Amino acid sequence: MTTTENAQPRLKTRYREEIKTALNDEFKYANVMQIPGVVKVVVNMGVGDAARDAKLINGAVTDLALITGQKPEIRKARKSIAQFKLREGMPIGARVTLRGDRMWEFLDRLVSIALPRIRDFRGLSPKQFDGKGNYTFGLTEQSMFHEIDVDSIDRPRGMDITVVTSATTDDEGRALLRQLGFPFKEN
């Protein structure tokens, strides 16, 4: 009989072994439970043109499923807006909430593979924190992820990525994400 060990995500192991102690040394927490960590990652893809053509949402759902490894939730319009020819209940986007090992694997792929593949990339803005240590940024197209076949893209779709942390201040959240390998611009 053989015993198989579950492979831990690389970034999760690094967080537990190195990053937690580095953050504790930097901020001098009274309790180890105060050390900030990543709670969840939300990937949202808005498809405004889906109001006119409902088939466009399928491409966004397929792309998000390939990128995240999880089936996206189709988001529907909450209100009708006549100027946008939008009715309540029409599909207008797709969203995935990643937690646990899938979240760590996605963050690892994002930081080590996807972000360096962006043309003319000079780093993420360090000013996009929400005041509670959570970070949101946008990507203009999905082709930087290696799971997406560049030839099969019907149109470029952008996405918003929100990294929710248990940090209480922006400085703690920034320190956590910098330790995880997020490339922030130096001002």
From Swiss-Prot:
Subunit structure: Part of the 50S ribosomal subunit; part of the 5S rRNA/L5/L18/L25 subcomplex. Contacts the 5S rRNA and the P site tRNA. Forms a bridge to the 30S subunit in the 70S ribosome.
Listed Pfam families: Ribosomal_L5 (PF00281), Ribosomal_L5_C (PF00673)
Keywords from the UniProt entry: Ribonucleoprotein, Ribosomal protein, RNA-binding, rRNA-binding, tRNA-binding
The protein, known as: Large ribosomal subunit protein uL5
SUPFAM superfamilies named among the record's database cross-references: RL5-like
Domain of life: Bacteria
UniProt keyword annotation of tRNA-binding present: yes
Family recorded in the similarity comment: Belongs to the universal ribosomal protein uL5 family.
Keyword rRNA-binding: yes
Any GO MF annotation of the entry: rRNA binding
Covalent S-S links between cysteines: none
Reported function: This is one of the proteins that bind and probably mediate the attachment of the 5S RNA into the large ribosomal subunit, where it forms part of the central protuberance. In the 70S ribosome it contacts protein S13 of the 30S subunit (bridge B1b), connecting the 2 subunits; this bridge is implicated in subunit movement. Contacts the P site tRNA; the 5S rRNA and some of its associated proteins might help stabilize positioning of ribosome-bound tRNAs.
Native source organism of the sequence: Mycobacteroides abscessus (strain ATCC 19977 / DSM 44196 / CCUG 20993 / CIP 104536 / JCM 13569 / NCTC 13031 / TMC 1543 / L948) (Mycobacterium abscessus)
NCBIfam families: PRK00010.1
